[in-house]
Amino acid sequence: MIEKVYEFKRDAKTKVVEKLVNTEHVQINHIVLPRGEQMPKHYSNSYVHLIIIKGEMTLTLEDQEPHNYKEGNIVYVPFNVKMLIQNINSDILEFFVVKAPHPKKLNAPEDPIKCE
């Protein structure tokens, strides 16, 4: 079999952070955040695409005002940008994080660096 299949949790009601794909070329994470949850504030460790498949994401980049993005949106975040992802408005926020190239190709740590 040439292809490789990756599975992710479906219909989660609690916080989920899954690193699904971690190859030399790309990282893909699956994240579910119930209302009121957020990811730690951190710097993007690659060129990031956030693919929102359920709910509404509140995203704050650097010192900008927060912006809301809804399911069906794909949001691009450049490399080495301070970011905060929150679920303020939805019962469940579900999204994928695609990092390409793999952070190691940019001499960045595999896991993002948290910031204040």
Curated annotation (Swiss-Prot):
Domain of life according to the entry: Archaea
InterPro entries assigned to the protein according to its UniProt record, in alphabetical order: Cupin_1, RmlC-like_jellyroll, RmlC_Cupin_sf
CDD domains: cupin_Mj0764-like
SUPFAM superfamilies to which the protein is assigned, alphabetical: RmlC-like cupins
Protein name according to UniProt: Uncharacterized protein MJ0764
